[in-house]
């Protein structure tokens, strides 16, 4: 359609010549102007506008409005447009219902828009004056409303348009190629016909489109679930979401993206979350078992789109993780290696840290769930604190196979993660103190730096109160080294001899070290006892008022041992010879690294060939439990450790059993370390009960100290509030039970540190 011409040009056409108009207009003249304008509007609608003059038409419309005939012009315009749309346009569209419907409607819409732009330009003055004053729709919008009501929303056209669009989209979803441009034009038309709103587009297309889509996706989800594994299903859902977004971009209005994606998410994800997650041989557990980080990442990404999606995943993951963790901590049984036990937990943590980082976007919910699960199952086993300490002990001892200091550091950092999950940190501290003492006293620490690094980690985690005793142990070692240097200088200066004994004494501060107040008895052999007495006199001369108590259970010794192998008779048979009577090529010398108790037992055999269990007990005075353990190490261990033989050859040690030196003892090593039976497996049951008793005693004091601290500051408190406050203060070390706290409160009331108030027995006051 060509534009209106800007003037009459060289044409001799006088029909449209502008004449001067009178100041007042009679009806006849008004009608003639309207007829002229009406004819021009109809010509524009028929696309015959080439001979029309824009100026003349504008001036005529201006004249009508100026002389208060705007209403006639506005009403006339509405009637002309309505008539054209009903009689011509609607008929054309109705005739095309079964043939080229969308193309016909689109063409009619384009023609109508073009015509209305031209008509608006002619009637611009009416828009500015009459429309503004009377608060009616402007010319262009009036044209849109009439087109909407008389064409697009006309009964069967409206239904046919909706159905056509829905059918085309349904066909495209099945893989057919459709005219996307026609769909896009129709959707744009519906949006424009909403006049600044979405109502027409929403009611005539979007709502039924979303409804149809929901049904389609419902069917699709059933098909996908029946035919695919979880990972393939997830990929198909992702593809479906992307396809729907792409369709919106190219065919529909952008505002439809959010609602259609929500429909896909609801029908393909939300309604089937549990089914997808719990799919046998392909769901979340399968992915976790087989380390499928990529598939887990896809599931996380998809489930993060819907409400409770990640919660559903988390619950399933948590259930699997707890099952794995419980299996690890309950597999303990007899002979479970503490290092393997902790390594198993660390490996499990590493696996789930990898999932957290690579699959779950370091999500806070997953992070908290994993931490909560580890705390849950780690604390199911009361031996976890001891085993963690033994694990660290293993890493900080000399002779760790090929690990650099940096690798040890990394392992210790991982161990600290488990330590954070531990509720009984005070139990760990007690064991750590024992194991550190053993490392320091046997000179087995891999390095002072590594030890101090570990203490620094514990200090950062629990504060200096937790590590003050451990740091005190290091100070004692340093002071002991200085003391021993001074002692050796003293021996040189005085010429005093230790009788061939190379003595090293560590003076330990009671309270820092795991010393025993009731020290186990032990009759130390004369030579080492004499050497120690010389040291005692030297030390007490320097430090008057101090007392030295030997801690036999913490000592060690290197013994020079000579074994006389079997001697052959003339007939070729062999006879075992004990003692030091025979020398020859069969003599083998070793240095035996033993505990103080083992040294005391072995040195008896310098005096006699055989001893019964009762005789050894009588001679050494070692407590029965310690004696049995020492003899088992010497007579029942591996062949390369068996320096004594026992009759009968059983694992148990009882009265009447006879012990002799094993002269057939051989070892490839010159220096032989005699392992203490069960030391690597942690404490025996009686020892564990004893440790637990000590921990409980310590806890009583800690709970009472916390109660007094709180009451001193608050003066008056209700029972439940006090219990909560005490728990809060102590939870970094252990979780005291309310029953134990109540007992400690009662103990403090008896000792008159606290008192109950007369009016309420559940309220306590501090007694200064």
UniProtKB/Swiss-Prot annotation:
Pathway: Protein modification; protein ubiquitination
Sample GO molecular function, one term: identical protein binding
Covalent cross-link (Glycyl lysine isopeptide (Lys-Gly) (interchain with G-Cter in NEDD8)), residues: 712
Phosphoserine: residues bearing it: 585
Domain Cullin neddylation: 698-760
SUPFAM superfamilies per UniProt: Cullin homology domain, Cullin repeat-like, Winged helix' DNA-binding domain
Annotated stretches, region: Interaction with KLHL18: 2-41
Biased composition (Basic and acidic residues): 682-698
One record GO biological process: negative regulation of Rho protein signal transduction
Locations listed in the record: Nucleus; Golgi apparatus; Cell projection, Cilium, Flagellum; Cytoplasm, Cytoskeleton, Spindle
Biological role stated in the UniProt entry: Core component of multiple cullin-RING-based BCR (BTB-CUL3-RBX1) E3 ubiquitin-protein ligase complexes which mediate the ubiquitination and subsequent proteasomal degradation of target proteins. BCR complexes and ARIH1 collaborate in tandem to mediate ubiquitination of target proteins. As a scaffold protein may contribute to catalysis through positioning of the substrate and the ubiquitin-conjugating enzyme.
Miscellaneous comment in the UniProt entry for this protein: High-glucose conditions in renal tubular epithelial cells lead to up-regulation of CUL3 expression, significant increase in CUL3-mediated ubiquitination of MRPL12 and dysregulation of mitochondrial biosynthesis.
Protein family: Belongs to the cullin family.
Subunit structure: Forms neddylation-dependent homodimers. Component of multiple BCR (BTB-CUL3-RBX1) E3 ubiquitin-protein ligase complexes formed of CUL3, RBX1 and a variable BTB domain-containing protein acting as both, adapter to cullin and substrate recognition subunit. The BCR complex may be active as a heterodimeric complex, in which NEDD8, covalently attached to one CUL3 molecule, binds to the C-terminus of a second CUL3 molecule. Interacts with RBX1, RNF7, CYCE and TIP120A/CAND1. Part of the BCR(SPOP) containing SPOP, and of BCR containing homodimeric SPOPL or the heterodimer formed by SPOP and SPOPL.
Entry protein name: Cullin-3
Species: Homo sapiens
Lineage of origin: Eukaryota, Metazoa, Chordata, Craniata, Vertebrata
Gene this protein is translated from: CUL3
């Amino acid at each position: 359609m060509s534009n209106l011409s800007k003037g009459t040009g060289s044409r001799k056409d006088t029909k449209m010549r502008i004449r001067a108009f009178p100041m007042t207009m009679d009806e006849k003249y008004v009608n003639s102007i309207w007829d002229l304008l009406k004819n021009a509007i109809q010509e524009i609608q028929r696309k015959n506008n080439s001979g029309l003059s824009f100026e003349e038409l504008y001036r005529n419309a201006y004249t009508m409005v100026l002389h208060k005939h705007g209403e006639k012009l506005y009403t006339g315009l509405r009637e002309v447009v309505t008539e054209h749309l009903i009689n011509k346009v609607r008929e054309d569209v109705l005739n095309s219902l079964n043939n080229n419907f969308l193309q016909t409607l689109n063409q009619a819409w384009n023609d109508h828009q073009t015509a209305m732009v031209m008509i608006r330009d002619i009637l611009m003055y009416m828009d500015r004056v009459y429309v503004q004053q009377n608060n009616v729709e402007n010319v262009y919008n009036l044209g849109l409303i009439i087109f909407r009501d008389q064409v697009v929303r006309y009964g069967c056209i409206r239904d046919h348009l909706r159905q056509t669009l829905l059918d085309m989209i349904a066909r495209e979803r099945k893989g057919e190629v459709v005219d996307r441009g026609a769909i896009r034009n129709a959707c744009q038309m519906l949006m424009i016909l909403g006049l600044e709103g979405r109502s027409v587009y929403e009611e005539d297309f979007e709502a039924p489109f979303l409804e149809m889509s929901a049904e389609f996706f419902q069917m699709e989800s059933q098909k996908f679930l029946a035919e695919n594994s979880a990972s393939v299903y997830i990929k198909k859902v992702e593809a479906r979401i992307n396809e729907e977004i792409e369709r919106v971009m190219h065919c529909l209005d952008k505002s439809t993206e959010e609602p259609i994606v929500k429909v896909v998410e609801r029908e393909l994800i939300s309604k089937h979350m549990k089914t997808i997650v719990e799919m046998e041989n392909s769901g979340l557990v399968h992915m976790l078992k087989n380390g499928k980080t990529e598939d887990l990442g896809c599931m996380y990404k998809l489930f993060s789109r819907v409400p409770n999606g990640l919660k559903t995943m988390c619950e399933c993951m948590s259930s699997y993780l707890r099952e794995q963790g419980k299996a690890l901590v309950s597999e303990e049984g007899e002979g479970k290696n503490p290092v393997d036990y902790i390594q198993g937990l660390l490996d499990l943590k590493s696996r789930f840290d990898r999932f957290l980082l690579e699959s779950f976007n370091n999500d806070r919910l997953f992070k908290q769930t994993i931490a909560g699960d580890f705390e849950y199952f780690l604390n199911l086993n009361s031996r976890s604190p001891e085993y963690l300490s033994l694990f660290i002990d293993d890493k900080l001892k000399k002779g760790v196979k090929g690990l650099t200091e940096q690798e040890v550091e990394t392992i210790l950092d991982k161990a600290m993660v488990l330590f954070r999950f531990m509720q009984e940190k005070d139990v760990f501290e007690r064991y750590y103190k024992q194991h550190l003492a053993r490392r320091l006293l046997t000179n087995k620490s891999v390095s002072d730096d590594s030890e101090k690094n570990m203490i620094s980690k514990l200090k950062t985690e629990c504060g200096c109160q937790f590590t003050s005793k451990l740091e005190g142990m290091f100070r004692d070692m340093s002071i002991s080294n200085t003391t021993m240097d001074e002692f050796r200088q003293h021996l040189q200066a005085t010429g005093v001899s230790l009788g061939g004994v190379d003595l090293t004494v560590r003076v330990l501060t009671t309270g820092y070290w795991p010393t025993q107040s009731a020290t186990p008895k032990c009759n130390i052999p004369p030579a080492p006892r004499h050497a120690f007495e010389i040291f005692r006199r030297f030390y007490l001369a320097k430090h008057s008022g101090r007392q030295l108590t030997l801690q036999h259970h913490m000592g060690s010794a290197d013994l020079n041992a000579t074994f006389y192998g079997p001697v052959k008779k003339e007939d070729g048979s062999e006879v075992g010879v004990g003692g030091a009577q025979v020398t020859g090529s069969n003599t083998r010398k070793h240095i035996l690294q033993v505990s103080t108790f083992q040294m005391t037992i072995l040195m008896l055999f310098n005096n006699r060939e055989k001893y019964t269990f009762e005789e050894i007990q009588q001679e050494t005075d070692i407590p029965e439990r310690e004696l049995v353990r020492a003899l088992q190490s010497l007579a029942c261990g591996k062949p390369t450790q068996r320096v004594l033989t026992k009759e009968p050859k059983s694992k148990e040690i009882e009265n009447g059993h006879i012990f002799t030196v094993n002269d057939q003892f051989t070892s490839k090593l010159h220096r032989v370390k005699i392992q203490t039976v069960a030391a690597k497996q942690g404490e025996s049951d009686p020892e564990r009960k004893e440790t637990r008793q000590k921990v409980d005693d310590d806890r009583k004091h800690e709970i009472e100290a916390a109660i007094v601290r709180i009451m001193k500051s608050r003066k008056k408190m209700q029972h439940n509030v006090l219990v909560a406050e005490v728990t809060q203060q102590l939870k970094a070390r252990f979780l005291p039970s309310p029953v134990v706290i109540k007992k400690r409160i009662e103990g403090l009331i008896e000792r008159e540190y606290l008192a109950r108030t007369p009016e309420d027995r559940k309220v306590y006051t501090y007694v200064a």
